[in-house]
């Protein structure tokens, strides 16, 4: 792991080396000129999927951090700087690395960057993470098919492992769970750990689960996904084992 500074930019890479193109790695235009953009996804901003296996060992997802809500209309992507380790991209990078090393199915963090403004008070942030191949989020799948009982149980066990590490996924919803088709089995992944972190006690865990259930119920009406109380019962039974 290598952390370094170039002018007003700070980088961390999951490699023991410095890259000359460090700045360009976080610019979508660079990858477009290289003809290495292999897809994209729209959310608060655009996440770009990149063909980088020959450079980083895996293909990557490039994401810029944007604010949401009313405040995001006034200030779309600047955050107040206090310490490097608490910036949005560095904090998510370190959390993903911890979970990855603990064996949880999360994207491997590849690199993160922050760029301070002229006064050094605010910063903008970006992150490169592993692209999970051959995967879809649950809502996309559940629009066209039901999932077997074992898949719901796998999701429950995964969330339990996360909670046992005292990590709260503050945006735990059906869109942030991916299902990957790997040979003859399906594997669940958790993504998007922005603003997530360690939380003491147990009081929040049931609330976190309920948040996930509400997201499924919301998408039943909005996207007509196939989700039943039995699906939820299978998930929670595995969680409580």
Curated annotation (Swiss-Prot):
Pathway: Bacterial outer membrane biogenesis; LPS core biosynthesis. This is 3-deoxy-D-manno-octulosonic acid kinase. It comes from Haemophilus influenzae (strain 86-028NP). GO terms for molecular function: ATP binding; protein serine/threonine kinase activity. Pfam families: Kdo. It comes from the Bacteria. The gene is kdkA. Its EC number is 2.7.1.166. It is a peripheral membrane protein. PANTHER family: EKC_KEOPS COMPLEX SUBUNIT TP53RK, NON-SPECIFIC SERINE/THREONINE PROTEIN KINASE. InterPro entries: KDO_kinase, Kinase-like_dom_sf. It catalyses: an alpha-Kdo-(2->6)-lipid IVA + ATP = a 4-O-phospho-alpha-Kdo-(2->6)-lipid IVA + ADP + H(+).
């Amino acid at each position: 792991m290598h952390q370094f500074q170039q002018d007003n930019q700070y980088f961390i890479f999951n490699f023991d080396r410095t890259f000359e193109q460090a700045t360009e790695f976080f610019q979508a235009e660079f990858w477009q000129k290289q003809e290495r953009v292999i897809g994209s996804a729209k959310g608060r901003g655009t996440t770009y999927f990149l063909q980088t296996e020959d450079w980083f060992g895996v293909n990557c997802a490039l994401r810029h951090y944007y604010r949401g809500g009313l405040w995001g209309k006034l200030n779309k992507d600047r955050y107040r700087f206090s310490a490097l380790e608490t910036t949005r991209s560095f904090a998510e990078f370190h959390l993903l690395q911890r979970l990855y090393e603990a064996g949880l199915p999360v994207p491997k963090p590849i690199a993160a960057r922050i760029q301070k403004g002229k006064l050094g008070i605010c910063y903008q942030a970006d992150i490169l993470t592993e692209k999970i191949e051959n995967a879809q989020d649950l809502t996309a799948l559940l629009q066209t098919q039901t999932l077997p009982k074992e898949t719901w149980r796998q999701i429950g066990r995964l969330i339990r492992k996360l909670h046992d590490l005292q990590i709260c996924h503050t945006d735990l919803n059906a869109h942030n769970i991916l299902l990957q088709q790997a040979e003859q089995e399906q594997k669940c992944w958790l993504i998007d750990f922005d603003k997530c972190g360690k939380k003491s006690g147990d009081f929040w865990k049931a609330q976190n689960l309920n948040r996930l259930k509400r997201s499924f119920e919301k998408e039943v009406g909005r996207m007509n996904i196939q989700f039943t109380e039995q699906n939820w019962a299978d998930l929670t039974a595995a969680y409580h084992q």
